[in-house]
C-alpha cells in the first residue's frame, strides 16, 4: 500500500465515521476542528482505522495524534514495521 492508498483509506474512513463529507480531510486537519468531534467519535474512528488497515494503535500513540498528518505518519510507520 502506498501513501496515496493510505490517505484514501483514512479519508474514506473519516467520512464514514464523522459523517462530514464537506470537510477536507487533509494532513493539516486538527481532529478537534471536525464538526461534532467528541471522545466517542474519536474511539470509533481509531477502531475503524485499525480494522481498515489491520493495525493496532496503543494509548500513547493515540494521545499524541492531533492531526490527520500525525495519523498518516503513524500508519506508515506501523505498516513498514
Outline where the language-model segments fall.
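Thiotemplate assembly-line natural product biosynthesis machinery
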Residues: 1-23, 77-81
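Alpha-helical structural signal
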Residues: 14, 42-43, 68
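Glycine-rich loop motifs involved in handling phospho/adenylate chemistry
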Residues: 26-38, 59-69
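Phosphopantetheinylated carrier protein domains
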Residues: 42-64
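Charged low-complexity stretches with an acidic bias
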Residues: 63-81
Amino acid at each position: 500500500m502506498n501513501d496515496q492508498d493510505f490517505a484514501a483509506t483514512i479519508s474514506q474512513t473519516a467520512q464514514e465515521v464523522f459523517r462530514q463529507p464537506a470537510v477536507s480531510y487533509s494532513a493539516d486537519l486538527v481532529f478537534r476542528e471536525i464538526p461534532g468531534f467528541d471522545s466517542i467519535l474519536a474511539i470509533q474512528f481509531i477502531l475503524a482505522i485499525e480494522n481498515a488497515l489491520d493495525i493496532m494503535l496503543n494509548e500513547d500513540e493515540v494521545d499524541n495524534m492531533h492531526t490527520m498528518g500525525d495519523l498518516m505518519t503513524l500508519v506508515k510507520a506501523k505498516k513498514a514495521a
